[in-house]
């Protein structure tokens, strides 16, 4: 049964911010948008995701090429590198990881994250607009969540279990994202996502299929 709180608005983030930094990213991505802005910004993300194809195969190839790297590095770089290539960007995984650590409103920003944001905006064409925010936000959203999902899958793997079945089980039993935050009657409320790991309602993750394909491609290599 869906939790009606999942459809409530997210906690507000400051809107009057200087363009180009982490706070600007928060103020312009669908993830933290006000209801009146959310549908438009989510559509920008969907437009970037729609042309992507063969992500499982591409993640497989990149993971195979990186097989001698530490697993933790593979998990942190391959998802971002695959999606960045689909967006026509170079491997920006290092900068995305830096921004990801400061992305959520309850975390602190810092000079490293601000510098990374400037490089990412420049890599996206230099315009600090909603499309650029959508592209960077897409990669940030993929960074930690996909790494955690694949990491949990590697820990939980049972002999003979294939990537698809393993991921389905992990999402049921030990999802990487267990709670989200919503704004109810002027207060922040945590909403349980255990039974809906990709969210619910209008804020459901638009990249679920893409994340699963990338995760499967990585596991196809690492489980061998």
Describe the predicted segments one by one.
Residues 45, 79-80, 142, 170, ...:
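A residue-level signal for conserved active-site and pocket-lining positions in enzyme catalytic cores
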Residues 134-135, 142-164, 206-224:
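Cytochrome P450 catalytic-core helices
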Residues 190-216:
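Cytochrome P450 heme-binding Cys-pocket and its upstream "meander" loop
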Residues 126, 160-192:
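Conserved cytochrome P450 K-helix E-x-x-R motif and the immediately C-terminal K′/meander segment
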Residues 20, 28, 131-133, 137, ...:
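Long, low-complexity intrinsically disordered regions
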Residues 135-137, 142-153, 179-180, 185-196:
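Conserved active-site beta-strand-loop modules that form the wall/rim of enzyme catalytic pockets
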Residues 80-140:
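Cytochrome P450 catalytic core segment centered on helix I
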Residues 1-73, 84-89:
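Active-site substrate-recognition loop segments, prototypically the cytochrome P450 B′-helix/B-C loop
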């Amino acid at each position: 049964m869906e939790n009606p709180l999942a459809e409530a608005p997210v906690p507000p983030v400051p809107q009057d911010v200087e363009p180009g930094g982490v706070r600007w990213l928060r103020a312009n991505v669908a993830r933290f948008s006000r209801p009146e802005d959310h549908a438009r910004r989510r559509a920008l993300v969907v437009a970037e995701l729609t042309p992507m194809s063969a992500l499982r195969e591409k993640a497989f190839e990149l993971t195979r090429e990186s097989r001698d790297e530490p697993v933790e590095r593979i998990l942190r770089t391959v998802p971002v590198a695959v999606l960045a290539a689909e967006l026509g960007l170079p491997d920006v995984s290092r900068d995305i990881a830096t921004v990801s650590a400061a992305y959520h409103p309850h975390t602190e920003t810092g000079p490293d994250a601000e510098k990374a944001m400037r490089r990412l905006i420049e890599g996206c064409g230099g315009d600090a607009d909603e499309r650029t925010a959508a592209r960077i936000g897409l990669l940030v959203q993929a960074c930690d969540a996909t790494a955690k999902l694949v990491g949990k899958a590697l820990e939980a793997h049972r002999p003979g279990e294939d990537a698809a079945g393993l991921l389905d089980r992990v999402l049921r039993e030990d999802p990487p994202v267990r709670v989200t935050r919503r704004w109810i009657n002027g207060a922040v409320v945590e909403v349980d996502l255990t039974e809906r790991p990709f969210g619910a309602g209008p804020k459901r993750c638009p990249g679920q299929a893409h994340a699963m394909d990338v995760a499967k491609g990585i596991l196809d290599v690492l489980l061998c």
